[in-house]
Amino acid sequence: MKYFEVGGQEVVTSVLAVRFTKQGHNIVIVSFNPPARLMKERLPEDIPFYVLDGFHYSRKNIKMIRNILEKHRIKVVINQWGLPYLPILVLRKACGKQNIKIVSVYHNDPGTNARLKIVEEQIKQVAGKWCKIILKIKWHIFRIATGVSMHYVYNYSDRYMLLSQSFVSSFKRFAYLTKNDKVQILPNPITIPSSDFIFDFLQKRKEVLYVGRIDENQKRIHRIIDTWALLEASFPDWKLIIVGDGVEKRNLVGKVIQLKLNNVVFEGFQNPSLYYKRASILMLTSEYEGFGLVVVEAMSFGVIPVVYGSYSAVYDIISDGVDGVILPYNKKGYDTEFATEKMKELMLDADKRNNLAQAAIITSKRYSVESIVDSWNKLFAKL
Protein backbone atom coordinates (compact mmCIF):
# COMPACT_ATOMS: atom_id res chain seq x y z
CA MET A 1 0.00 0.00 0.00
CA LYS A 2 1.14 3.57 -0.64
CA TYR A 3 -0.37 4.82 2.61
CA PHE A 4 -2.16 3.32 5.58
CA GLU A 5 -4.45 6.23 6.35
CA VAL A 6 -7.99 6.52 7.70
CA GLY A 7 -10.16 5.14 4.94
CA GLY A 8 -12.28 2.23 3.78
CA GLN A 9 -9.45 0.49 1.94
CA GLU A 10 -7.27 0.50 5.05
CA VAL A 11 -10.10 -0.66 7.30
CA VAL A 12 -10.84 -3.56 4.95
CA THR A 13 -7.14 -4.47 4.94
CA SER A 14 -7.06 -4.48 8.75
CA VAL A 15 -10.18 -6.62 9.09
CA LEU A 16 -8.98 -9.17 6.53
CA ALA A 17 -5.50 -9.27 8.09
CA VAL A 18 -6.91 -10.03 11.53
CA ARG A 19 -9.26 -12.71 10.21
CA PHE A 20 -6.57 -14.38 8.08
CA THR A 21 -4.21 -14.41 11.07
CA LYS A 22 -6.84 -16.14 13.22
CA GLN A 23 -7.15 -18.80 10.52
CA GLY A 24 -3.42 -19.50 10.69
CA HIS A 25 -2.17 -17.48 7.73
CA ASN A 26 1.16 -15.69 8.14
CA ILE A 27 0.17 -12.05 7.51
CA VAL A 28 2.44 -9.04 7.00
CA ILE A 29 1.40 -5.49 6.02
CA VAL A 30 3.76 -3.27 4.03
CA SER A 31 3.28 0.44 3.29
CA PHE A 32 5.48 2.75 1.23
CA ASN A 33 4.78 5.60 3.67
CA PRO A 34 4.24 5.80 7.47
CA PRO A 35 0.74 4.84 8.66
CA ALA A 36 -1.81 7.05 10.34
CA ARG A 37 -1.61 6.53 14.10
CA LEU A 38 -5.33 5.73 14.38
CA MET A 39 -5.09 2.97 11.77
CA LYS A 40 -1.89 1.49 13.14
CA GLU A 41 -3.47 1.24 16.59
CA ARG A 42 -6.31 -0.86 15.13
CA LEU A 43 -3.89 -3.64 14.26
CA PRO A 44 -2.93 -6.34 16.78
CA GLU A 45 0.74 -6.36 17.74
CA ASP A 46 1.20 -9.87 16.33
CA ILE A 47 0.71 -8.59 12.76
CA PRO A 48 4.08 -7.21 11.55
CA PHE A 49 3.91 -3.79 9.89
CA TYR A 50 6.75 -2.56 7.71
CA VAL A 51 7.27 0.94 6.32
CA LEU A 52 9.37 1.35 3.18
CA ASP A 53 11.54 4.29 2.16
CA GLY A 54 8.83 6.37 0.49
CA PHE A 55 6.80 5.90 -2.68
CA HIS A 56 9.53 5.54 -5.29
CA TYR A 57 11.57 2.96 -7.16
CA SER A 58 14.84 2.40 -5.33
CA ARG A 59 17.34 -0.30 -4.46
CA LYS A 60 16.55 0.24 -0.80
CA ASN A 61 12.83 -0.46 -1.29
CA ILE A 62 13.59 -3.50 -3.43
CA LYS A 63 15.98 -4.87 -0.81
CA MET A 64 13.53 -4.21 2.05
CA ILE A 65 10.69 -6.01 0.28
CA ARG A 66 12.96 -8.92 -0.69
CA ASN A 67 14.02 -9.32 2.95
CA ILE A 68 10.38 -9.25 4.11
CA LEU A 69 9.37 -11.87 1.54
CA GLU A 70 12.23 -14.18 2.55
CA LYS A 71 11.94 -13.65 6.32
CA HIS A 72 8.21 -14.40 6.41
CA ARG A 73 8.21 -16.96 3.58
CA ILE A 74 5.51 -15.10 1.71
CA LYS A 75 3.66 -17.04 -0.99
CA VAL A 76 0.95 -14.52 -1.96
CA VAL A 77 1.10 -10.72 -2.10
CA ILE A 78 -2.16 -8.77 -2.14
CA ASN A 79 -1.51 -5.43 -3.80
CA GLN A 80 -4.28 -3.22 -2.41
CA TRP A 81 -3.62 -0.38 -4.83
CA GLY A 82 -4.25 -1.79 -8.29
CA LEU A 83 -3.79 1.42 -10.28
CA PRO A 84 -0.14 2.67 -10.23
CA TYR A 85 2.51 0.52 -11.87
CA LEU A 86 5.27 1.40 -9.37
CA PRO A 87 4.34 -1.04 -6.56
CA ILE A 88 4.27 -3.93 -9.04
CA LEU A 89 7.53 -2.82 -10.64
CA VAL A 90 9.28 -2.78 -7.25
CA LEU A 91 7.63 -6.04 -6.18
CA ARG A 92 8.63 -7.88 -9.37
CA LYS A 93 12.24 -6.85 -8.89
CA ALA A 94 12.13 -7.91 -5.23
CA CYS A 95 10.57 -11.29 -6.00
CA GLY A 96 13.26 -12.22 -8.50
CA LYS A 97 12.84 -15.90 -9.37
CA GLN A 98 10.72 -16.70 -6.31
CA ASN A 99 7.36 -18.24 -7.17
CA ILE A 100 5.24 -15.61 -5.40
CA LYS A 101 1.68 -15.00 -6.58
CA ILE A 102 0.33 -11.45 -6.89
CA VAL A 103 -3.31 -10.45 -6.47
CA SER A 104 -3.96 -6.79 -7.30
CA VAL A 105 -7.16 -5.15 -6.08
CA TYR A 106 -8.82 -2.00 -7.39
CA HIS A 107 -11.09 -0.47 -4.76
CA ASN A 108 -12.88 2.03 -6.99
CA ASP A 109 -14.78 2.34 -10.24
CA PRO A 110 -12.10 1.45 -12.83
CA GLY A 111 -13.64 3.83 -15.35
CA THR A 112 -12.54 6.96 -13.51
CA ASN A 113 -10.31 8.31 -10.75
CA ALA A 114 -9.65 11.43 -8.70
CA ARG A 115 -7.24 13.05 -11.17
CA LEU A 116 -9.68 12.71 -14.06
CA LYS A 117 -12.58 14.04 -11.98
CA ILE A 118 -10.58 17.12 -10.98
CA VAL A 119 -9.89 17.96 -14.62
CA GLU A 120 -13.52 17.28 -15.57
CA GLU A 121 -14.66 19.81 -12.97
CA GLN A 122 -12.13 22.34 -14.25
CA ILE A 123 -13.45 21.89 -17.80
CA LYS A 124 -16.97 22.65 -16.59
CA GLN A 125 -15.90 25.78 -14.73
CA VAL A 126 -13.59 27.54 -17.21
CA ALA A 127 -15.10 29.84 -19.83
CA GLY A 128 -12.30 30.34 -22.36
CA LYS A 129 -12.23 28.16 -25.48
CA TRP A 130 -8.47 27.59 -25.39
CA CYS A 131 -8.52 26.83 -21.68
CA LYS A 132 -11.09 24.11 -22.32
CA ILE A 133 -9.00 22.68 -25.16
CA ILE A 134 -5.86 22.59 -23.00
CA LEU A 135 -7.76 20.93 -20.15
CA LYS A 136 -9.26 18.35 -22.49
CA ILE A 137 -5.77 17.51 -23.75
CA LYS A 138 -4.64 17.22 -20.12
CA TRP A 139 -7.58 14.89 -19.41
CA HIS A 140 -6.65 12.61 -22.32
CA ILE A 141 -3.02 12.48 -21.19
CA PHE A 142 -4.11 11.48 -17.68
CA ARG A 143 -6.56 8.99 -19.15
CA ILE A 144 -3.93 7.30 -21.30
CA ALA A 145 -1.34 7.27 -18.52
CA THR A 146 -3.81 5.72 -16.08
CA GLY A 147 -4.96 3.10 -18.56
CA VAL A 148 -1.41 2.09 -19.45
CA SER A 149 -0.53 1.85 -15.75
CA MET A 150 -3.51 -0.40 -15.00
CA HIS A 151 -2.64 -2.49 -18.06
CA TYR A 152 0.86 -3.03 -16.64
CA VAL A 153 -0.48 -3.99 -13.21
CA TYR A 154 -2.95 -6.44 -14.77
CA ASN A 155 -0.29 -8.08 -16.96
CA TYR A 156 2.04 -8.73 -14.03
CA SER A 157 -0.61 -9.90 -11.56
CA ASP A 158 -1.87 -13.46 -11.26
CA ARG A 159 -5.34 -12.15 -10.46
CA TYR A 160 -6.83 -8.67 -10.74
CA MET A 161 -9.74 -8.12 -8.39
CA LEU A 162 -12.70 -5.80 -8.96
CA LEU A 163 -15.48 -5.14 -6.47
CA SER A 164 -18.38 -5.68 -8.89
CA GLN A 165 -19.18 -7.67 -12.01
CA SER A 166 -20.57 -4.46 -13.47
CA PHE A 167 -17.03 -3.01 -13.54
CA VAL A 168 -15.56 -5.65 -15.87
CA SER A 169 -16.41 -4.09 -19.23
CA SER A 170 -15.29 -0.59 -18.21
CA PHE A 171 -12.06 -1.98 -16.72
CA LYS A 172 -11.29 -3.91 -19.90
CA ARG A 173 -11.87 -0.81 -22.00
CA PHE A 174 -10.06 1.58 -19.63
CA ALA A 175 -6.97 -0.61 -19.25
CA TYR A 176 -6.69 -1.34 -22.99
CA LEU A 177 -7.17 -5.09 -22.51
CA THR A 178 -8.10 -7.59 -25.21
CA LYS A 179 -9.07 -10.23 -22.66
CA ASN A 180 -9.93 -10.32 -18.97
CA ASP A 181 -9.37 -13.93 -17.92
CA LYS A 182 -7.43 -12.89 -14.79
CA VAL A 183 -10.24 -10.71 -13.45
CA GLN A 184 -11.78 -11.87 -10.17
CA ILE A 185 -14.94 -10.37 -8.65
CA LEU A 186 -15.14 -10.07 -4.88
CA PRO A 187 -16.79 -7.27 -2.89
CA ASN A 188 -15.40 -5.90 0.34
CA PRO A 189 -16.68 -7.31 3.63
CA ILE A 190 -18.60 -5.49 6.32
CA THR A 191 -15.87 -4.35 8.69
CA ILE A 192 -17.97 -3.48 11.75
CA PRO A 193 -19.42 -6.39 13.76
CA SER A 194 -23.21 -6.35 13.96
CA SER A 195 -23.98 -9.94 14.96
CA ASP A 196 -25.10 -8.86 18.44
CA PHE A 197 -27.33 -6.08 17.07
CA ILE A 198 -31.05 -6.67 17.59
CA PHE A 199 -33.21 -4.49 15.40
CA ASP A 200 -35.92 -2.54 17.21
CA PHE A 201 -37.63 0.07 15.08
CA LEU A 202 -38.80 1.96 18.15
CA GLN A 203 -35.16 2.51 19.16
CA LYS A 204 -34.35 4.20 15.88
CA ARG A 205 -34.01 7.97 16.09
CA LYS A 206 -35.06 10.48 13.49
CA GLU A 207 -31.54 10.89 12.22
CA VAL A 208 -30.08 11.08 8.73
CA LEU A 209 -26.47 9.95 8.72
CA TYR A 210 -23.35 10.48 6.63
CA VAL A 211 -20.23 8.46 7.43
CA GLY A 212 -16.91 8.96 5.65
CA ARG A 213 -14.29 11.44 4.52
CA ILE A 214 -15.33 15.05 4.05
CA ASP A 215 -13.95 15.27 0.55
CA GLU A 216 -15.37 17.30 -2.32
CA ASN A 217 -13.75 15.55 -5.27
CA GLN A 218 -15.33 12.18 -4.59
CA LYS A 219 -17.85 12.35 -1.75
CA ARG A 220 -19.61 15.63 -2.70
CA ILE A 221 -21.16 16.04 0.75
CA HIS A 222 -22.41 19.50 -0.18
CA ARG A 223 -25.16 17.64 -2.04
CA ILE A 224 -26.40 16.21 1.24
CA ILE A 225 -26.34 19.67 2.81
CA ASP A 226 -28.26 21.13 -0.15
CA THR A 227 -30.86 18.38 0.18
CA TRP A 228 -31.08 18.86 3.93
CA ALA A 229 -31.60 22.60 3.44
CA LEU A 230 -34.87 21.77 1.65
CA LEU A 231 -35.92 19.33 4.38
CA GLU A 232 -35.02 20.88 7.73
CA ALA A 233 -37.89 23.35 8.06
CA SER A 234 -40.48 20.63 7.34
CA PHE A 235 -38.86 18.10 9.68
CA PRO A 236 -37.74 20.02 12.81
CA ASP A 237 -37.60 16.79 14.86
CA TRP A 238 -35.00 15.24 12.53
CA LYS A 239 -31.21 15.75 12.58
CA LEU A 240 -28.43 15.35 10.04
CA ILE A 241 -25.38 13.72 11.63
CA ILE A 242 -22.01 13.88 9.84
CA VAL A 243 -19.43 11.39 11.11
CA GLY A 244 -16.00 11.94 9.58
CA ASP A 245 -13.43 14.59 8.83
CA GLY A 246 -11.35 15.89 5.97
CA VAL A 247 -9.91 18.86 4.13
CA GLU A 248 -13.32 20.24 3.16
CA LYS A 249 -14.81 20.27 6.66
CA ARG A 250 -14.27 24.00 7.23
CA ASN A 251 -16.00 24.84 3.95
CA LEU A 252 -18.88 22.52 4.76
CA VAL A 253 -19.36 24.02 8.23
CA GLY A 254 -19.35 27.45 6.60
CA LYS A 255 -22.04 26.34 4.19
CA VAL A 256 -24.22 25.10 7.06
CA ILE A 257 -23.83 28.46 8.84
CA GLN A 258 -24.54 30.38 5.65
CA LEU A 259 -27.75 28.41 5.08
CA LYS A 260 -28.72 28.94 8.75
CA LEU A 261 -29.27 25.24 9.35
CA ASN A 262 -29.79 24.35 13.01
CA ASN A 263 -30.05 20.57 13.01
CA VAL A 264 -26.74 19.59 11.44
CA VAL A 265 -24.18 18.00 13.77
CA PHE A 266 -20.50 17.39 12.91
CA GLU A 267 -19.08 14.56 15.02
CA GLY A 268 -15.57 14.21 13.52
CA PHE A 269 -13.90 10.81 13.23
CA GLN A 270 -15.73 8.35 15.49
CA ASN A 271 -16.46 4.66 15.64
CA PRO A 272 -19.67 4.66 13.56
CA SER A 273 -21.29 1.68 15.32
CA LEU A 274 -23.20 3.83 17.82
CA TYR A 275 -24.50 6.05 15.02
CA TYR A 276 -25.54 3.08 12.86
CA LYS A 277 -27.47 1.59 15.78
CA ARG A 278 -29.63 4.65 16.25
CA ALA A 279 -29.87 6.29 12.78
CA SER A 280 -32.79 5.72 10.42
CA ILE A 281 -31.35 6.79 7.05
CA LEU A 282 -27.87 6.92 5.50
CA MET A 283 -27.13 9.29 2.61
CA LEU A 284 -24.26 8.82 0.15
CA THR A 285 -24.05 11.21 -2.80
CA SER A 286 -20.57 10.50 -4.16
CA GLU A 287 -19.60 11.39 -7.71
CA TYR A 288 -17.90 8.00 -7.97
CA GLU A 289 -17.32 4.99 -5.73
CA GLY A 290 -15.95 1.49 -5.91
CA PHE A 291 -18.28 -0.27 -3.54
CA GLY A 292 -19.36 2.16 -0.85
CA LEU A 293 -18.54 0.10 2.23
CA VAL A 294 -20.59 2.37 4.50
CA VAL A 295 -23.70 1.34 2.56
CA VAL A 296 -23.61 -2.33 3.56
CA GLU A 297 -22.32 -1.53 7.04
CA ALA A 298 -25.27 0.77 7.65
CA MET A 299 -27.68 -1.80 6.21
CA SER A 300 -26.44 -4.40 8.69
CA PHE A 301 -27.72 -2.12 11.47
CA GLY A 302 -31.08 -1.49 9.81
CA VAL A 303 -30.15 1.94 8.45
CA ILE A 304 -31.87 2.59 5.11
CA PRO A 305 -29.38 3.65 2.41
CA VAL A 306 -30.31 6.50 0.08
CA VAL A 307 -27.52 6.47 -2.49
CA TYR A 308 -26.80 8.46 -5.64
CA GLY A 309 -26.50 5.96 -8.50
CA SER A 310 -23.23 7.37 -9.82
CA TYR A 311 -21.51 3.97 -9.74
CA SER A 312 -22.77 0.68 -11.10
CA ALA A 313 -21.92 -1.46 -8.05
CA VAL A 314 -24.67 0.19 -6.02
CA TYR A 315 -27.19 -1.66 -8.19
CA ASP A 316 -25.58 -4.94 -7.07
CA ILE A 317 -26.16 -4.00 -3.45
CA ILE A 318 -29.50 -2.19 -3.30
CA SER A 319 -32.85 -3.20 -4.76
CA ASP A 320 -34.48 0.19 -5.16
CA GLY A 321 -37.59 0.50 -3.02
CA VAL A 322 -37.02 -2.89 -1.37
CA ASP A 323 -33.99 -2.49 0.93
CA GLY A 324 -32.97 1.06 0.11
CA VAL A 325 -33.33 3.92 -2.35
CA ILE A 326 -31.19 4.65 -5.41
CA LEU A 327 -31.26 8.21 -6.71
CA PRO A 328 -30.79 7.79 -10.49
CA TYR A 329 -27.60 9.19 -11.95
CA ASN A 330 -28.16 12.40 -13.91
CA LYS A 331 -25.61 13.51 -16.53
CA LYS A 332 -26.66 17.11 -15.89
CA GLY A 333 -25.76 16.72 -12.24
CA TYR A 334 -27.24 15.63 -8.93
CA ASP A 335 -30.97 16.45 -8.79
CA THR A 336 -31.44 18.01 -5.35
CA GLU A 337 -35.20 18.43 -5.66
CA PHE A 338 -35.73 14.80 -6.70
CA ALA A 339 -33.56 13.62 -3.81
CA THR A 340 -35.55 15.82 -1.44
CA GLU A 341 -38.83 14.25 -2.54
CA LYS A 342 -37.45 10.73 -2.07
CA MET A 343 -36.22 11.64 1.40
CA LYS A 344 -39.60 13.11 2.31
CA GLU A 345 -41.32 9.86 1.35
CA LEU A 346 -39.14 7.96 3.80
CA MET A 347 -39.21 10.50 6.59
CA LEU A 348 -43.01 10.72 6.51
CA ASP A 349 -43.70 6.98 6.35
CA ALA A 350 -42.69 5.02 9.45
CA ASP A 351 -44.09 1.73 8.13
CA LYS A 352 -42.03 2.04 4.96
CA ARG A 353 -38.90 2.77 6.98
CA ASN A 354 -39.54 -0.28 9.14
CA ASN A 355 -39.96 -2.58 6.14
CA LEU A 356 -36.94 -1.28 4.25
CA ALA A 357 -34.75 -1.41 7.35
CA GLN A 358 -35.51 -5.08 8.00
CA ALA A 359 -34.95 -5.95 4.34
CA ALA A 360 -31.62 -4.07 4.43
CA ILE A 361 -30.41 -6.25 7.32
CA ILE A 362 -31.15 -9.41 5.33
CA THR A 363 -29.35 -8.07 2.25
CA SER A 364 -26.27 -7.11 4.26
CA LYS A 365 -25.61 -10.72 5.26
CA ARG A 366 -24.24 -11.38 1.75
CA TYR A 367 -21.27 -9.21 2.70
CA SER A 368 -20.35 -10.75 6.03
CA VAL A 369 -16.66 -11.13 6.86
CA GLU A 370 -17.10 -14.90 7.04
CA SER A 371 -18.50 -15.08 3.50
CA ILE A 372 -15.84 -12.82 1.95
CA VAL A 373 -12.92 -14.48 3.77
CA ASP A 374 -14.16 -17.87 2.59
CA SER A 375 -14.05 -16.58 -1.00
CA TRP A 376 -10.50 -15.30 -0.46
CA ASN A 377 -9.39 -18.70 0.84
CA LYS A 378 -10.86 -20.40 -2.22
CA LEU A 379 -8.89 -17.98 -4.39
CA PHE A 380 -5.66 -18.71 -2.51
CA ALA A 381 -6.19 -22.44 -3.09
CA LYS A 382 -6.46 -21.90 -6.85
CA LEU A 383 -3.33 -19.79 -7.24
Language-model region placement:
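N-terminal strand-loop element at the rim of the active site
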Residues: 2-7, 13, 18-56, 167-170, ...
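A conserved mid-protein helix/loop that constitutes part of the nucleotide-sugar donor-binding site
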Residues: 10-15, 206, 215-230, 247-253
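Nucleotide-activated donor-binding/catalytic signature segment of Leloir-type glycosyltransferases, i.e.
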Residues: 48, 251-269
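Short His-centered aromatic/hydrophobic patch
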Residues: 79-86, 106-109
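A short, active-site helix/loop in glycosyltransferases that binds the activated sugar's phosphate group
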Residues: 139-182
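Aromatic "clamp/platform" in nucleotide-sugar-dependent glycosyltransferases that forms part
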Residues: 287
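Short hydrophobic beta-strand element within catalytic cores of glycosyltransferases
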Residues: 304-308, 318
